[in-house]
Amino acid sequence: MTTNTVPLHPYWPRHLKLDNFVPNDLPTSHILVGLFSISGGLIVITWLLSSRASVVPLGAGRRLALCWFAVCTFIHLVIEGWFSLYNGILLEDQAFLSQLWKEYSKGDSRYILSDSFVVCMETVTACLWGPLSLWVVIAFLRQQPFRFVLQLVVSMGQIYGDVLYFLTELHEGLQHGEIGHPVYFWFYFVFLNAVWLVIPSILVLDAIKHLTSAQSVLDSKVMKIKSKHN
């Protein structure tokens, strides 16, 4: 006589055997409030800092962009950095960030499975885009001449990683989450990651606009110098 056993975990595919899984002891609301509170605090601090610490006045749009990069610094360095270091013990670990990743994994179980792609992708993100996001903030506050180059590089890197993130899961048949679930699929998997396609795309166009304008000015000056010599 066979019996259907219900998996003792919330992850997909449902047949996954996760013997060392320890359920979160923090409510989902506490985890999400903690995450968004820290992010909100960083936005407020960066908004105020961009008004007082910048060597030249910055417009509202530029200050919002710096708030974005400040949040990216936190998420890439701290949250994704934690995953890069401790992905092998997430299932049984009860640290706040481990519980955050176990919660997010309800939308994409590749994270609690230490999938090769997500481990490598998140490690690159933590090591490169985290520090460089902080550098973008500093570069704009100090009006460093390469600031738009940094913005372009970081934003392109974020888009590239996000596109691969979606495409690899699509290639595997979206099997690591419950398709259509309003929270786990649409909010965790789709919305939270789509943000890293939309905002970086806007910032890529912004950087291209400023770099193109600067190149046009330089070309114009060079042409004037050449015309004088001729």
Curated annotation (Swiss-Prot):
Pfam families attached to this UniProt entry: EBP
Swiss-Prot/TrEMBL keywords: Acetylation, Cholesterol biosynthesis, Cholesterol metabolism, Cytoplasmic vesicle, Disease variant, Endoplasmic reticulum, Hydrolase, Isomerase, Lipid biosynthesis, Lipid metabolism, Membrane, Nucleus, Steroid biosynthesis, Steroid metabolism, Sterol biosynthesis, Sterol metabolism, Transmembrane, Transmembrane helix
Location in the cell: Endoplasmic reticulum membrane; Nucleus envelope; Cytoplasmic vesicle
Signal peptide region: none
Reaction equation(s) it catalyzes: lathosterol = 5alpha-cholest-8-en-3beta-ol; zymosterol = 5alpha-cholesta-7,24-dien-3beta-ol; 5,6alpha-epoxy-5alpha-cholestan-3beta-ol + H2O = 5alpha-cholestane-3beta,5,6beta-triol; 5,6beta-epoxy-5beta-cholestan-3beta-ol + H2O = 5alpha-cholestane-3beta,5,6beta-triol
Pathway assignment: Steroid biosynthesis; cholesterol biosynthesis
Entries under PROSITE patterns matching the protein: EXPERA (PS51751)
GO biological process: cholesterol biosynthetic process; hemopoiesis; ossification involved in bone maturation; sterol biosynthetic process
GO cellular component terms given for this protein: cytoplasmic vesicle; endoplasmic reticulum; endoplasmic reticulum membrane; intracellular membrane-bounded organelle; nuclear envelope; nuclear membrane
MF-aspect GO terms: C-8 sterol isomerase activity; cholestenol delta-isomerase activity; cholesterol-5,6-oxide hydrolase activity; identical protein binding; steroid Delta-isomerase activity
Enzyme Commission designation: 5.3.3.5, 3.3.2.11
Domain of life: Eukaryota
Bilayer disposition of the protein: Multi-pass membrane protein
Primary location class: endoplasmic reticulum
Segments crossing the lipid bilayer: 29-49, 66-86, 121-141, 185-205
Annotated EXPERA domain residues: 61-204
The keyword Endoplasmic reticulum appears for this protein: yes
Other remarks in the entry: Binds to the phenylalkylamine calcium-ion antagonist emopamil, an anti-ischemic drug.
Function: Isomerase that catalyzes the conversion of Delta(8)-sterols to their corresponding Delta(7)-isomers.
Involvement in disorder: Defects in Ebp are a cause of 'Tattered' (Td) which is an X-linked, semidominant mouse mutation associated with prenatal male lethality. Heterozygous females are small and at 4 to 5 days of age develop patches of hyperkeratotic skin where no hair grows, resulting in a striping of the coat in adults. Craniofacial anomalies and twisted toes have also been observed in some affected females.
Family: Belongs to the EBP family.
Protein's name according to its UniProt entry: 3-beta-hydroxysteroid-Delta(8),Delta(7)-isomerase
Organism in which the protein naturally occurs: Mus musculus
